[in-house]
Amino acid sequence: MRRRESRGAKGGGFLTPPPSWHTTRRVYIAMPISERKRSPLIENQESFRVRTGDSPYVRAKHAQLVSKDPNRAISLFWAAINAGDRVDSALKDMVVVLKQLNRFDEGIEAIKSFRYLCPFESQDSIDNLLLELYMKSGRITEVAELLEHKLRTLEQDKHYGGRIKIAKRSHEEQNNKTIEQEKARILGNLAWVHLQLHNYGIAEQYYRNALSLEPDNNKLCNLAICLIRMERTHEAKSLLEDVKQSLGNQWKNEPFCKSFERATEMLAEREQATVADKPEDLLTSSFSDNFSSRCSGGMKGKKALAGTSTELGNIHKTNSHASSESVEQNSPGLTTQPRECKWVDEEVDQSKWDATIGASRKLRFWTVGPVRSLRFGNDYQKNLKSVGTAASTTNDELHQFISSDADCMTSKARKLCPELIKDKEDNEKESERIASESSSAYAKITDIGQRKVLHIDQRKVRHIGQRSV
Protein backbone atom coordinates (compact mmCIF):
# COMPACT_ATOMS: atom_id res chain seq x y z
CA MET A 1 0.00 0.00 0.00
CA ARG A 2 1.57 3.26 -1.09
CA ARG A 3 1.80 6.20 1.15
CA ARG A 4 2.24 9.80 0.25
CA GLU A 5 5.85 10.80 -0.02
CA SER A 6 5.23 14.01 1.76
CA ARG A 7 3.25 13.42 4.87
CA GLY A 8 2.75 17.12 5.30
CA ALA A 9 1.02 17.44 1.99
CA LYS A 10 -2.52 18.59 1.90
CA GLY A 11 -5.06 15.83 2.20
CA GLY A 12 -2.73 13.31 3.66
CA GLY A 13 -3.70 9.64 3.81
CA PHE A 14 -3.82 6.69 1.48
CA LEU A 15 -3.88 7.21 -2.27
CA THR A 16 -5.71 4.00 -2.92
CA PRO A 17 -9.41 4.36 -3.78
CA PRO A 18 -12.01 3.42 -1.16
CA PRO A 19 -13.52 -0.05 -1.28
CA SER A 20 -16.61 -0.63 -3.41
CA TRP A 21 -18.85 -1.65 -0.52
CA HIS A 22 -18.70 1.88 0.81
CA THR A 23 -19.99 3.43 -2.44
CA THR A 24 -22.69 0.94 -3.43
CA ARG A 25 -25.83 1.15 -1.33
CA ARG A 26 -27.76 -1.98 -0.50
CA VAL A 27 -31.47 -2.02 -1.35
CA TYR A 28 -33.70 -3.96 1.03
CA ILE A 29 -37.01 -5.19 -0.43
CA ALA A 30 -39.81 -5.19 2.11
CA MET A 31 -41.57 -8.52 2.32
CA PRO A 32 -45.35 -8.75 2.50
CA ILE A 33 -46.83 -9.06 5.96
CA SER A 34 -48.25 -12.48 5.15
CA GLU A 35 -44.77 -13.85 4.30
CA ARG A 36 -42.96 -12.47 7.31
CA LYS A 37 -42.08 -14.65 10.25
CA ARG A 38 -44.24 -13.97 13.24
CA SER A 39 -43.12 -14.42 16.78
CA PRO A 40 -45.21 -16.62 19.09
CA LEU A 41 -46.17 -13.56 21.14
CA ILE A 42 -47.69 -11.82 18.12
CA GLU A 43 -49.47 -14.99 16.98
CA ASN A 44 -51.18 -15.43 20.35
CA GLN A 45 -52.11 -11.75 20.64
CA GLU A 46 -55.72 -10.82 19.82
CA SER A 47 -56.50 -8.48 16.93
CA PHE A 48 -58.24 -6.01 19.27
CA ARG A 49 -56.92 -4.24 22.28
CA VAL A 50 -58.39 -4.96 25.69
CA ARG A 51 -57.56 -2.77 28.62
CA THR A 52 -55.75 -4.37 31.48
CA GLY A 53 -56.88 -4.11 35.07
CA ASP A 54 -59.73 -5.18 37.30
CA SER A 55 -62.04 -2.17 37.18
CA PRO A 56 -65.76 -2.52 36.32
CA TYR A 57 -65.27 -0.89 32.93
CA VAL A 58 -62.40 -3.27 32.03
CA ARG A 59 -64.47 -6.30 33.02
CA ALA A 60 -67.36 -5.01 30.89
CA LYS A 61 -65.09 -4.53 27.87
CA HIS A 62 -63.67 -8.02 28.37
CA ALA A 63 -67.20 -9.47 28.38
CA GLN A 64 -68.05 -7.50 25.25
CA LEU A 65 -64.94 -8.24 23.16
CA VAL A 66 -63.48 -11.49 24.50
CA SER A 67 -66.36 -13.45 26.00
CA LYS A 68 -68.85 -12.20 23.37
CA ASP A 69 -71.58 -12.06 26.00
CA PRO A 70 -73.60 -8.88 25.31
CA ASN A 71 -76.12 -9.34 28.12
CA ARG A 72 -73.39 -9.74 30.74
CA ALA A 73 -71.52 -6.80 29.18
CA ILE A 74 -74.61 -4.59 29.54
CA SER A 75 -74.94 -5.43 33.23
CA LEU A 76 -71.22 -4.74 33.78
CA PHE A 77 -71.49 -1.42 31.93
CA TRP A 78 -74.37 -0.48 34.24
CA ALA A 79 -72.13 -1.33 37.20
CA ALA A 80 -69.33 0.84 35.77
CA ILE A 81 -71.71 3.79 35.32
CA ASN A 82 -73.02 3.45 38.86
CA ALA A 83 -69.46 3.17 40.19
CA GLY A 84 -68.38 6.28 38.25
CA ASP A 85 -65.68 4.39 36.31
CA ARG A 86 -65.25 6.11 32.92
CA VAL A 87 -68.92 7.02 32.73
CA ASP A 88 -68.86 8.53 29.24
CA SER A 89 -67.09 5.53 27.67
CA ALA A 90 -69.22 3.02 29.59
CA LEU A 91 -72.43 4.78 28.53
CA LYS A 92 -71.48 4.94 24.86
CA ASP A 93 -70.27 1.33 24.77
CA MET A 94 -73.42 0.13 26.49
CA VAL A 95 -75.60 2.02 23.97
CA VAL A 96 -73.66 0.41 21.11
CA VAL A 97 -74.36 -3.06 22.55
CA LEU A 98 -78.05 -2.20 23.03
CA LYS A 99 -78.23 -1.03 19.43
CA GLN A 100 -76.74 -4.34 18.26
CA LEU A 101 -79.49 -6.16 20.19
CA ASN A 102 -82.22 -3.89 18.65
CA ARG A 103 -83.10 -2.51 22.08
CA PHE A 104 -83.33 1.06 20.85
CA ASP A 105 -85.75 2.43 23.43
CA GLU A 106 -83.56 1.26 26.30
CA GLY A 107 -80.55 2.97 24.74
CA ILE A 108 -82.49 6.23 24.34
CA GLU A 109 -83.59 6.17 27.97
CA ALA A 110 -80.06 5.38 29.15
CA ILE A 111 -78.62 8.37 27.26
CA LYS A 112 -81.31 10.71 28.54
CA SER A 113 -80.78 9.50 32.12
CA PHE A 114 -76.96 9.56 32.37
CA ARG A 115 -75.64 11.99 29.79
CA TYR A 116 -75.47 14.75 32.39
CA LEU A 117 -72.68 12.76 34.10
CA CYS A 118 -70.53 12.90 30.95
CA PRO A 119 -68.07 15.73 30.22
CA PHE A 120 -68.77 18.43 27.65
CA GLU A 121 -66.33 17.03 25.08
CA SER A 122 -68.29 13.78 24.74
CA GLN A 123 -71.72 15.37 24.26
CA ASP A 124 -71.35 15.58 20.48
CA SER A 125 -70.64 11.86 20.10
CA ILE A 126 -73.52 11.07 22.47
CA ASP A 127 -75.82 13.18 20.26
CA ASN A 128 -74.70 11.19 17.24
CA LEU A 129 -75.54 7.93 19.01
CA LEU A 130 -78.92 9.33 20.00
CA LEU A 131 -79.60 10.30 16.38
CA GLU A 132 -78.83 6.75 15.25
CA LEU A 133 -81.20 5.32 17.86
CA TYR A 134 -83.95 7.73 16.83
CA MET A 135 -83.51 6.73 13.19
CA LYS A 136 -83.54 3.02 13.99
CA SER A 137 -86.70 3.35 16.04
CA GLY A 138 -88.44 5.46 13.39
CA ARG A 139 -88.80 8.60 15.51
CA ILE A 140 -88.15 11.09 12.71
CA THR A 141 -89.66 14.06 14.52
CA GLU A 142 -87.20 13.68 17.41
CA VAL A 143 -84.37 13.50 14.87
CA ALA A 144 -85.42 16.84 13.39
CA GLU A 145 -85.66 18.45 16.84
CA LEU A 146 -82.23 17.18 17.88
CA LEU A 147 -80.61 18.36 14.64
CA GLU A 148 -82.16 21.81 15.02
CA HIS A 149 -80.84 21.94 18.60
CA LYS A 150 -77.34 21.01 17.38
CA LEU A 151 -77.55 23.68 14.69
CA ARG A 152 -78.51 26.35 17.22
CA THR A 153 -75.72 25.38 19.62
CA LEU A 154 -73.22 25.39 16.76
CA GLU A 155 -74.22 28.90 15.72
CA GLN A 156 -74.22 30.25 19.28
CA ASP A 157 -71.18 28.50 20.71
CA LYS A 158 -67.85 30.25 20.09
CA HIS A 159 -65.77 27.88 22.16
CA TYR A 160 -64.08 26.24 19.18
CA GLY A 161 -62.35 29.36 17.88
CA GLY A 162 -63.03 28.70 14.21
CA ARG A 163 -62.09 25.00 14.02
CA ILE A 164 -63.71 21.80 15.28
CA LYS A 165 -61.71 18.70 16.11
CA ILE A 166 -63.58 15.43 15.85
CA ALA A 167 -61.73 12.29 16.98
CA LYS A 168 -62.41 8.93 15.38
CA ARG A 169 -62.25 6.26 18.04
CA SER A 170 -61.75 3.36 15.64
CA HIS A 171 -58.57 4.74 14.08
CA GLU A 172 -57.48 6.98 16.94
CA GLU A 173 -56.88 9.94 14.66
CA GLN A 174 -58.33 13.42 14.41
CA ASN A 175 -59.99 15.15 11.48
CA ASN A 176 -60.17 18.91 11.48
CA LYS A 177 -63.37 20.50 10.23
CA THR A 178 -64.34 24.11 10.06
CA ILE A 179 -67.56 25.41 11.53
CA GLU A 180 -68.93 25.92 8.01
CA GLN A 181 -68.28 22.29 7.08
CA GLU A 182 -69.93 21.00 10.24
CA LYS A 183 -72.86 23.33 9.71
CA ALA A 184 -73.24 22.13 6.12
CA ARG A 185 -73.26 18.52 7.35
CA ILE A 186 -75.99 19.23 9.93
CA LEU A 187 -78.05 21.17 7.37
CA GLY A 188 -77.81 18.27 4.93
CA ASN A 189 -78.98 15.80 7.57
CA LEU A 190 -81.79 18.14 8.59
CA ALA A 191 -82.88 18.51 4.96
CA TRP A 192 -82.92 14.73 4.53
CA VAL A 193 -85.11 14.37 7.64
CA HIS A 194 -87.63 16.91 6.32
CA LEU A 195 -87.57 15.10 3.00
CA GLN A 196 -88.69 11.95 4.82
CA LEU A 197 -91.40 13.97 6.57
CA HIS A 198 -92.66 15.22 3.15
CA ASN A 199 -91.81 18.83 4.04
CA TYR A 200 -90.36 19.45 0.60
CA GLY A 201 -90.25 23.25 0.80
CA ILE A 202 -88.29 23.23 4.08
CA ALA A 203 -86.00 20.48 2.77
CA GLU A 204 -85.22 22.54 -0.34
CA GLN A 205 -84.25 25.55 1.78
CA TYR A 206 -81.93 23.48 3.99
CA TYR A 207 -80.30 21.81 0.97
CA ARG A 208 -79.65 25.15 -0.72
CA ASN A 209 -78.18 26.60 2.50
CA ALA A 210 -75.90 23.59 2.88
CA LEU A 211 -74.75 23.83 -0.75
CA SER A 212 -73.99 27.52 -0.32
CA LEU A 213 -71.57 26.61 2.50
CA GLU A 214 -69.99 23.55 0.88
CA PRO A 215 -70.59 22.03 -2.59
CA ASP A 216 -71.58 18.38 -2.43
CA ASN A 217 -72.88 16.15 -5.21
CA ASN A 218 -74.82 13.95 -2.80
CA LYS A 219 -76.78 16.97 -1.59
CA LEU A 220 -77.37 18.00 -5.21
CA CYS A 221 -78.89 14.60 -6.00
CA ASN A 222 -81.11 14.75 -2.92
CA LEU A 223 -82.16 18.28 -3.90
CA ALA A 224 -83.13 16.94 -7.32
CA ILE A 225 -85.29 14.28 -5.62
CA CYS A 226 -86.93 17.02 -3.56
CA LEU A 227 -87.67 19.05 -6.70
CA ILE A 228 -89.15 16.01 -8.43
CA ARG A 229 -91.48 15.54 -5.47
CA MET A 230 -92.55 19.16 -5.91
CA GLU A 231 -93.36 18.61 -9.63
CA ARG A 232 -90.39 20.77 -10.73
CA THR A 233 -88.89 18.24 -13.09
CA HIS A 234 -87.10 20.75 -15.34
CA GLU A 235 -84.96 22.10 -12.48
CA ALA A 236 -84.22 18.58 -11.24
CA LYS A 237 -83.20 17.47 -14.72
CA SER A 238 -80.79 20.40 -15.09
CA LEU A 239 -79.21 19.61 -11.70
CA LEU A 240 -78.67 15.95 -12.60
CA GLU A 241 -77.20 16.90 -15.97
CA ASP A 242 -74.76 19.27 -14.26
CA VAL A 243 -73.65 16.52 -11.87
CA LYS A 244 -73.19 14.05 -14.70
CA GLN A 245 -71.26 16.50 -16.87
CA SER A 246 -68.94 17.48 -14.03
CA LEU A 247 -67.90 13.87 -13.43
CA GLY A 248 -68.40 12.26 -16.83
CA ASN A 249 -68.42 8.47 -16.68
CA GLN A 250 -66.71 8.33 -13.28
CA TRP A 251 -69.88 9.00 -11.29
CA LYS A 252 -70.47 5.25 -10.86
CA ASN A 253 -67.41 5.04 -8.63
CA GLU A 254 -68.50 7.91 -6.41
CA PRO A 255 -70.15 7.36 -2.99
CA PHE A 256 -73.28 9.27 -4.08
CA CYS A 257 -74.00 6.93 -7.02
CA LYS A 258 -77.06 5.46 -5.27
CA SER A 259 -78.60 8.89 -4.78
CA PHE A 260 -77.90 9.76 -8.41
CA GLU A 261 -79.45 6.53 -9.68
CA ARG A 262 -82.49 7.00 -7.45
CA ALA A 263 -83.02 10.56 -8.68
CA THR A 264 -82.64 9.47 -12.32
CA GLU A 265 -85.18 6.67 -11.88
CA MET A 266 -87.68 9.01 -10.22
CA LEU A 267 -87.25 11.56 -13.01
CA ALA A 268 -87.86 8.92 -15.69
CA GLU A 269 -90.96 7.63 -13.87
CA ARG A 270 -92.37 11.14 -13.49
CA GLU A 271 -91.79 11.93 -17.17
CA GLN A 272 -93.54 8.71 -18.19
CA ALA A 273 -96.46 9.57 -15.91
CA THR A 274 -96.81 13.03 -17.44
CA VAL A 275 -96.70 11.54 -20.94
CA ALA A 276 -99.41 9.05 -19.98
CA ASP A 277 -101.57 11.83 -18.53
CA LYS A 278 -101.04 14.20 -21.48
CA PRO A 279 -100.30 12.21 -24.63
CA GLU A 280 -101.16 15.20 -26.83
CA ASP A 281 -97.89 16.88 -25.82
CA LEU A 282 -95.94 14.36 -27.88
CA LEU A 283 -98.22 14.89 -30.89
CA THR A 284 -97.95 18.67 -31.01
CA SER A 285 -96.18 18.80 -34.34
CA SER A 286 -98.48 16.29 -36.02
CA PHE A 287 -101.51 18.01 -34.54
CA SER A 288 -100.36 21.37 -35.91
CA ASP A 289 -99.89 19.82 -39.36
CA ASN A 290 -103.33 18.24 -39.26
CA PHE A 291 -104.83 21.48 -38.00
CA SER A 292 -103.28 23.49 -40.82
CA SER A 293 -104.45 20.97 -43.40
CA ARG A 294 -107.94 21.00 -41.94
CA CYS A 295 -107.97 24.78 -41.93
CA SER A 296 -107.02 24.78 -45.60
CA GLY A 297 -109.80 22.27 -46.24
CA GLY A 298 -112.22 24.54 -44.39
CA MET A 299 -111.19 27.50 -46.55
CA LYS A 300 -111.78 25.44 -49.64
CA GLY A 301 -115.22 24.52 -48.32
CA LYS A 302 -116.04 28.18 -47.76
CA LYS A 303 -114.98 29.04 -51.28
CA ALA A 304 -117.16 26.27 -52.60
CA LEU A 305 -120.12 27.53 -50.55
CA ALA A 306 -119.78 30.89 -52.23
CA GLY A 307 -120.64 29.18 -55.55
CA THR A 308 -123.78 27.42 -56.72
CA SER A 309 -125.79 24.78 -54.92
CA THR A 310 -124.54 22.05 -57.27
CA GLU A 311 -121.00 22.63 -56.04
CA LEU A 312 -122.26 22.29 -52.48
CA GLY A 313 -123.81 18.96 -53.33
CA ASN A 314 -120.50 17.77 -54.72
CA ILE A 315 -118.68 18.85 -51.56
CA HIS A 316 -121.16 16.98 -49.41
CA LYS A 317 -120.71 13.86 -51.53
CA THR A 318 -116.94 14.00 -51.32
CA ASN A 319 -117.14 14.24 -47.52
CA SER A 320 -119.57 11.35 -47.20
CA HIS A 321 -116.78 8.85 -46.55
CA ALA A 322 -114.88 11.08 -44.10
CA SER A 323 -115.18 11.17 -40.33
CA SER A 324 -117.39 13.56 -38.43
CA GLU A 325 -114.39 15.73 -37.51
CA SER A 326 -113.48 16.44 -41.13
CA VAL A 327 -117.07 17.21 -42.03
CA GLU A 328 -117.31 19.60 -39.11
CA GLN A 329 -114.10 21.31 -40.09
CA ASN A 330 -115.35 21.78 -43.66
CA SER A 331 -118.68 23.13 -42.46
CA PRO A 332 -119.22 26.94 -42.40
CA GLY A 333 -118.88 27.04 -38.60
CA LEU A 334 -118.17 24.74 -35.68
CA THR A 335 -121.32 22.82 -34.84
CA THR A 336 -120.40 22.67 -31.17
CA GLN A 337 -120.96 26.42 -30.78
CA PRO A 338 -124.32 28.26 -31.02
CA ARG A 339 -124.53 30.45 -34.07
CA GLU A 340 -126.85 32.78 -35.85
CA CYS A 341 -128.96 31.41 -38.68
CA LYS A 342 -130.28 34.27 -40.80
CA TRP A 343 -133.21 33.04 -42.85
CA VAL A 344 -133.35 35.12 -46.01
CA ASP A 345 -134.43 34.39 -49.52
CA GLU A 346 -130.93 34.05 -50.89
CA GLU A 347 -130.03 30.66 -52.31
CA VAL A 348 -126.51 30.75 -50.90
CA ASP A 349 -127.61 31.00 -47.26
CA GLN A 350 -130.25 28.35 -47.81
CA SER A 351 -127.62 26.09 -49.34
CA LYS A 352 -125.45 26.62 -46.27
CA TRP A 353 -128.28 25.22 -44.18
CA ASP A 354 -128.54 22.27 -46.57
CA ALA A 355 -124.80 21.57 -46.24
CA THR A 356 -124.92 21.45 -42.45
CA ILE A 357 -128.27 19.70 -42.23
CA GLY A 358 -126.97 16.57 -40.51
CA ALA A 359 -124.85 18.10 -37.77
CA SER A 360 -127.02 20.86 -36.28
CA ARG A 361 -130.16 19.04 -35.29
CA LYS A 362 -130.38 20.18 -31.67
CA LEU A 363 -128.89 23.66 -31.96
CA ARG A 364 -130.78 26.80 -31.11
CA PHE A 365 -131.12 29.37 -33.88
CA TRP A 366 -131.83 33.00 -33.33
CA THR A 367 -131.36 36.30 -35.11
CA VAL A 368 -130.67 39.82 -34.10
CA GLY A 369 -133.22 41.31 -36.54
CA PRO A 370 -136.64 42.78 -35.72
CA VAL A 371 -139.23 40.54 -34.16
CA ARG A 372 -141.88 39.22 -36.50
CA SER A 373 -145.22 37.64 -35.72
CA LEU A 374 -145.65 33.90 -36.12
CA ARG A 375 -148.08 32.49 -38.60
CA PHE A 376 -149.45 30.30 -35.90
CA GLY A 377 -148.77 32.73 -33.09
CA ASN A 378 -151.99 34.76 -32.73
CA ASP A 379 -153.87 32.19 -30.69
CA TYR A 380 -150.68 31.37 -28.89
CA GLN A 381 -150.19 34.97 -27.75
CA LYS A 382 -153.85 35.17 -26.59
CA ASN A 383 -153.35 32.05 -24.51
CA LEU A 384 -150.18 33.51 -23.05
CA LYS A 385 -152.08 36.60 -21.83
CA SER A 386 -154.73 34.46 -20.13
CA VAL A 387 -152.27 32.16 -18.37
CA GLY A 388 -150.99 32.94 -14.86
CA THR A 389 -147.44 33.58 -13.74
CA ALA A 390 -146.78 29.85 -13.27
CA ALA A 391 -146.77 29.10 -17.00
CA SER A 392 -145.67 32.49 -18.31
CA THR A 393 -141.95 31.93 -17.79
CA THR A 394 -141.69 28.73 -19.83
CA ASN A 395 -143.89 30.09 -22.60
CA ASP A 396 -141.84 33.29 -22.84
CA GLU A 397 -138.68 31.23 -23.14
CA LEU A 398 -140.30 29.15 -25.88
CA HIS A 399 -141.46 32.29 -27.62
CA GLN A 400 -137.91 33.66 -27.58
CA PHE A 401 -136.57 30.31 -28.66
CA ILE A 402 -138.77 30.22 -31.78
CA SER A 403 -137.76 33.68 -32.93
CA SER A 404 -139.35 36.26 -35.18
CA ASP A 405 -138.00 34.65 -38.30
CA ALA A 406 -140.33 31.71 -37.88
CA ASP A 407 -142.45 33.03 -40.77
CA CYS A 408 -139.73 31.94 -43.09
CA MET A 409 -139.28 28.52 -41.50
CA THR A 410 -139.72 25.92 -44.15
CA SER A 411 -140.98 22.39 -43.81
CA LYS A 412 -137.39 21.23 -43.91
CA ALA A 413 -136.56 23.32 -40.82
CA ARG A 414 -139.63 21.98 -39.01
CA LYS A 415 -138.44 18.44 -39.63
CA LEU A 416 -135.06 19.30 -38.16
CA CYS A 417 -136.43 20.21 -34.73
CA PRO A 418 -139.33 17.84 -33.98
CA GLU A 419 -138.51 17.84 -30.30
CA LEU A 420 -138.85 21.63 -30.10
CA ILE A 421 -142.20 21.56 -31.91
CA LYS A 422 -143.39 18.80 -29.62
CA ASP A 423 -142.37 20.85 -26.58
CA LYS A 424 -144.21 23.84 -28.01
CA GLU A 425 -147.39 21.82 -28.52
CA ASP A 426 -147.17 20.41 -25.00
CA ASN A 427 -146.75 23.92 -23.61
CA GLU A 428 -149.75 25.12 -25.60
CA LYS A 429 -151.88 22.30 -24.25
CA GLU A 430 -150.68 23.01 -20.74
CA SER A 431 -151.47 26.70 -21.13
CA GLU A 432 -154.95 25.92 -22.42
CA ARG A 433 -155.56 23.55 -19.50
CA ILE A 434 -154.37 26.12 -16.97
CA ALA A 435 -156.48 28.81 -18.63
CA SER A 436 -159.58 26.63 -18.54
CA GLU A 437 -158.98 25.70 -14.93
CA SER A 438 -158.43 29.31 -13.95
CA SER A 439 -161.57 30.44 -15.78
CA SER A 440 -163.67 27.72 -14.16
CA ALA A 441 -162.27 28.60 -10.76
CA TYR A 442 -163.04 32.26 -11.34
CA ALA A 443 -166.57 31.39 -12.37
CA LYS A 444 -167.06 29.34 -9.23
CA ILE A 445 -165.72 32.15 -7.06
CA THR A 446 -167.99 34.74 -8.68
CA ASP A 447 -171.00 32.41 -8.34
CA ILE A 448 -170.30 31.90 -4.66
CA GLY A 449 -169.90 35.63 -4.16
CA GLN A 450 -173.16 36.42 -5.87
CA ARG A 451 -174.97 33.85 -3.75
CA LYS A 452 -173.58 35.37 -0.57
CA VAL A 453 -174.64 38.86 -1.66
CA LEU A 454 -178.19 37.68 -2.42
CA HIS A 455 -178.40 35.90 0.92
CA ILE A 456 -177.29 39.04 2.78
CA ASP A 457 -179.76 41.21 0.87
CA GLN A 458 -182.62 38.85 1.70
CA ARG A 459 -181.72 38.94 5.40
CA LYS A 460 -181.65 42.74 5.37
CA VAL A 461 -185.07 42.90 3.70
CA ARG A 462 -186.56 40.56 6.26
CA HIS A 463 -185.10 42.57 9.12
CA ILE A 464 -186.47 45.84 7.75
CA GLY A 465 -189.93 44.26 7.27
CA GLN A 466 -190.01 43.02 10.83
CA ARG A 467 -189.05 46.45 12.18
CA SER A 468 -191.75 48.15 10.12
CA VAL A 469 -194.38 45.73 11.40
Curated annotation (Swiss-Prot):
InterPro entries: MS5/SDI1 (IPR044961), TPR-like_helical_dom_sf (IPR011990), TPR_2 (IPR013105), TPR_rpt (IPR019734). Transmembrane segments: none annotated. Residues 139-191 form a coiled coil. Signal peptide: none annotated. GO terms for cellular component: nucleus. Keywords: Cell cycle, Cell division, Coiled coil, Nucleus, Repeat, TPR repeat. Residues 1-20, 314-339 are annotated as: Disordered. One of its GO terms (biological process) is cell division. Its main location: nucleus. Expressed in floral and vegetative organs. Also barely detectable in leaves and stems. It comes from the Eukaryota. It holds the Pfam family TPR_2. It is found in: Nucleus. PANTHER family: PROTEIN POLLENLESS 3-LIKE 1 (PTHR36326:SF4), PROTEIN POLLENLESS 3-LIKE 2 (PTHR36326). Belongs to the MS5 protein family. This is Protein POLLENLESS 3-LIKE 1. It comes from Arabidopsis thaliana. The lineage of its organism: Eukaryota, Viridiplantae, Streptophyta, Embryophyta, Tracheophyta.
